Regions:
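Rossmann-like adenosine-cofactor binding region
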Residues: 56-60, 72-75, 188-241
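N-terminal glycine-/charge-rich "phosphate-binding" loop or analogous flexible N-terminal tail
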Residues: 6-63, 67-68, 179, 183, ...
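Glycine-rich NAD(P)-binding loop of Rossmann-like domains
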Residues: 137-170, 179
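Structural motif corresponding to alpha-helix initiation and N-cap regions
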Residues: 29, 48-52, 70-75, 96, ...
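Phosphate-coordination loops involved in phosphoryl transfer and adenosine-cofactor binding
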Residues: 13, 84, 155-158, 230, ...
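Phosphate/diphosphate ligand-binding glycine-rich loop within oxidoreductases
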Residues: 61-138, 142, 151-152
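Short, conserved loop/helix-junction motifs that constitute active-site signature segments
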Residues: 35-36, 77-83, 233-238
Length: 241
């Protein structure tokens, strides 16, 4: 009887697919062995050949753990995964999930809390790399040269931000620490937030024409799809990043 109950429990284990873990990081953050009594995990480290391949390989899974927008969870994919009950994404939002199709199938879609620090840190790594010519200097160093360019001092320069949400706020704080003047624009810019951060609210055109460094921190999608085009780039300072 005990053996029979054990077999029943095994049959009821939730089958979970972890998609697009091509950096092999999933097991660094979660000890999957501790969860093996309740869940049967399979990690997909390689991208699918196409959607038909994804449907074939994911047919038996009840839950998909997806990393960002690497594999689109389309209506066609959802409609063809008959056992699918859950879609869990890293981060709060995922533009690649067809939420309407999931809702019709009564599939639960949810996300995780976010760590706001990595994106501002990477943003500032890129800004500093541009201002101090990291790429060119590193390439020249490998050729035997040393200090071949002169960098740009950031203190006193204007940092322009499109978007002043969680990420934009942290980028602004670091900009102020460098002694930069920070300006911001977005369609739903909070004047109270600007006052709190000592950020100058402005029009989009003023932001484009005055910024020495322009950094964009808004959600993807149609709302800001054509936010920066060749027209805007032509208005920027020739020395701007």
């Amino acid at each position: 009887m005990q053996e029979y109950c054990y077999q029943i429990r095994k049959l009821k284990m939730l089958k979970v697919a972890i998609l697009d873990d091509y950096q092999n990081v999933a097991q660094q953050f979660v000890d999957l062995k501790k969860l093996s009594g309740k869940y049967e995990f399979k990690i997909f480290s390689e991208p699918f050949l196409d959607e038909a391949d994804a449907i074939e390989q994911l047919a038996d899974f009840e839950a998909l753990l997806i990393m960002r927008e690497r594999t689109p969870i389309t209506k066609n994919l959802i409609d063809n995964l008959n056992d699918l009950k859950f879609v869990i994404t890293s981060g709060l939002r995922n533009k690649s999930v067809d939420l309407e199709a999931a809702k019709k199938r009564k599939i639960i879609v949810c996300g995780t809390d976010i760590n706001v620090n990595p994106t501002p840190e990477l943003t500032w790594a890129l800004i500093l790399g541009l201002a101090r010519n990291f790429k060119e200097e590193i390439d020249n160093m490998y050729q035997g040269y040393w200090q071949t360019t002169i960098g740009v001092e950031l203190k006193g320069k204007i940092l322009g931000l499109i978007g002043l949400g969680r990420v934009g706020t942290e980028v602004a704080k670091i900009g102020k620490a460098f002694g930069m003047q920070v300006m911001a624009w977005s369609e739903n810019l909070s004047l109270d937030k600007c006052k709190e951060l000592d950020v100058l609210p402005c029009s989009k055109d003023d932001l484009i024409t005055n910024s020495d460094v322009l950094s964009i921190h808004v959600q993807g999608g149609n709302r800001y799809k054509d936010c920066i085009t060749l027209k805007e780039l032509d208005k920027m300072k020739k020395t701007a990043f």
